[in-house]
Design a protein with these regions (language model features):
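Short, glycine-/small-residue-rich phosphate/pyrophosphate-handling segment
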Residues: 99-125, 139-144, 259-292
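Buried hydrophobic positions in well-ordered alpha/beta secondary-structure cores of metabolic enzymes
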Residues: 9-12, 61, 114, 152, ...
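Short glycine-rich or small-residue beta-strand-to-loop segments that form or flank ligand, phosphate
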Residues: 2-8, 63-67, 164-170, 278-284
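N-terminal glycine-rich phosphate/adenylate-binding segment common to multiple enzyme folds
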Residues: 43-135, 223
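Glycine-rich phosphate/pyrophosphate-binding loop and the adjoining helix
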Residues: 51, 124-129, 133-166, 170-174, ...
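N-terminal beta-loop-helix "entrance" segment that forms/cooperates
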Residues: 30-52, 208
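Glycine-rich phosphate/diphosphate-binding loop of Rossmann-like nucleotide-binding domains
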Residues: 4-26, 130-202, 214
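Glycine-rich phosphate/nucleotide-binding loop
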Residues: 39-43, 207-307
Length: 330
């Protein structure tokens, strides 16, 4: 089968090579079509996303993407957001769990974040009323709320999860977050076998850093989902172990949660675990469950051993050396 591989910016090309090497070692049979998108591509072409990239994703329906840079406070819109909206990948799935060998404050984190991926403040509707007043629109619709909440409950049921928690700020944003919460409660009635509750976003952040084990599946509007994803990654050792999947009806785009890390780009220092774990998510969805399990087990065993590991978790190994060590375990 064919799948699109987008290296992206910064460390993207290095960790994309890790994916290629692992894919070959697992004999997945995937034929990678490398396509361009990102700030580095824009510097030479004047375009953020190559025209052929969109066509390739649409044709394949499957893509694995490296990190892409986004300027802060000015410049172009996030490429991630553009791709999610272009291909209607309405659900962003981000599993978070403790790995043996990674120094953290917690030993029993095992939760999943389900983030609405297409609207909220990330819709990008903002403008200047005057030189001194900026306005942004928080767009929340019932169809999108129902779709993401139903996805969360379906995921919980399929994967043996027992509880789904809605994340909101409906005590203040009574119309927008209120609509999300009301829709969540309506959908929950169709899943009597799954416990449903809700938590205000600021209280949730406190509870996550106190007792993360009390949570199972978290479903959230776009902005809150983005924020708690990084928070939860911090609970298990950082963004180096945070994969994600952008899921639509016709298209799936997998990626690491972390950024392009330009400060270490080209130095063979990046931890490829997150994108390899995202690749494992892709393999699982493709029906290659045994290969996905082997890859996850190899990563976990390599990290747990604590010898050939990257600098972000206290080691000295480079990207290539760590990748080869994982491959040796396959």
């Amino acid at each position: 089968m064919k799948a699109v591989l987008i290296p992206g910016d910064g460390i993207g090309r290095e960790i994309a090579e890790s994916v290629r090497a692992v894919s070959a070692a697992l004999n997945t049979g995937i034929e990678w079509q490398e396509c361009e998108a990102g700030a580095e591509y824009a510097e030479v072409s004047g375009e953020l996303i190559a025209p052929g990239t969109l066509d390739a994703i649409e044709a394949c329906g499957w893509a694995l993407k490296g990190p892409t840079a986004t300027p802060i406070g000015k410049g172009f819109r996030s490429i991630n957001v553009q791709l999610r909206q272009r291909f209607a990948t309405y659900a962003n799935l981000r599993p978070v769990h403790t790995l043996s060998g990674v120094p953290t404050r917690f030993e029993n984190v095992d939760l999943v974040i389900v983030r609405e991926n297409t609207e909220d403040l990330y819709k990008g509707i903002e403008y200047m009323l005057t030189d001194d007043i900026a306005n942004g629109v928080k767009l929340i619709t019932r169809p999108a709320c129902e779709k993401i909440c139903r996805f969360a409950f379906d995921y919980a049921r399929k994967n043996g999860r027992k509880k789904v928690t809605a994340v909101h700020k409906a005590n203040i944003m009574k119309l927008t977050d209120g609509l999300f919460l009301r829709t969540f409660r309506e959908v929950a009635e169709d899943y009597p076998d799954i416990e449903a509750n809700d938590c205000i976003i600021d209280a949730l952040c406190m509870k996550l850093v106190q007792r993360p084990e009390q949570f199972d599946v978290l479903v959230a509007p776009n902005l809150y989902g983005d924020i708690i994803s990084d928070l939860c990654a911090g609970l298990v050792g950082g963004l180096g172990f945070a994969p994600s999947a952008n899921i639509g009806d016709k298209t799936r785009i997998y990626e690491a949660v972390h950024g392009s890390a330009p400060d270490i780009a080209g130095q063979d220092k990046a931890n490829p675990s997150a994108i390899l774990m995202a690749f494992a998510m892709m393999l699982n969805d493709l029906g290659m469950t045994d290969k996905a399990d082997k890859l996850n087990a190899a990563i976990q065993a390599q990290v747990a051993e604590g010898k050939v590991i990257t600098a972000d978790i206290g080691g000295t190994a480079g990207t290539k050396e760590f990748t080869q060590a994982v491959i040796a375990r396959l």
